[in-house]
Amino acid sequence: MRILVYGAGVQGCELAHRLLQNKKNVVTMLARGEWKERIDQKGLTIRHWAQLKTTVDRVPTIETLAPEESYDIVFVTVQAGQLPEILPVLKQNKSEFFVFVGNQPHARSVLQAMQRPADKIAFGFQNLSLIHISEPTRL
C-alpha cells in the first residue's frame, strides 16, 4: 500500500514508524526544511521511553505534494491551525482517501473544503504516550 504521511511532527513521525512495521506498506513523509534534511540524512529517530529503546527508520520524504501524485491513502497530521494553508493542496491531489489525524475541531470545514464524498475522508486520533521524537538540534 502506498501511504503518505503529510506532516512530520510528533504524530506524523510516530504514525510513519508504526506503518513501516508492515513491510507491505510503502510509506513516504511530507516534511520541510531542517527536519526533512535530518530525516533524509539520519533517518527517522524515535526514543521509546517505555520500551527503553531507540528506533531509526529510513523513510523517503517529499517537500511538496503535487496534484498528479497518487497514494492509496494520505494521513494528514498537521496542526489544526495549518489546515487552511494545506487544504487547497490536498483538494487538488488525485489521491482518493484522506485521514485527518488529531485536527478534528474543523471537521465540517475540512469536508466542505475537500469537496469529496464523505466516505473518502475520515478523522482519527492517535495515542502518543511515552515517546520522544529526536529534534534535529539535539542530535
Predicted regions located by residue number:
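Rossmann-like NAD(P)(H) cofactor-binding subdomain of soluble oxidoreductases
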Residues: T54-S134
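Short "domain-exit" segments at the C-terminal end of structured domains
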Residues: E135-L139
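NAD(P)+-binding Rossmann beta1-loop-alpha1 motif at the extreme N-terminus of oxidoreductases
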Residues: M1-Q51
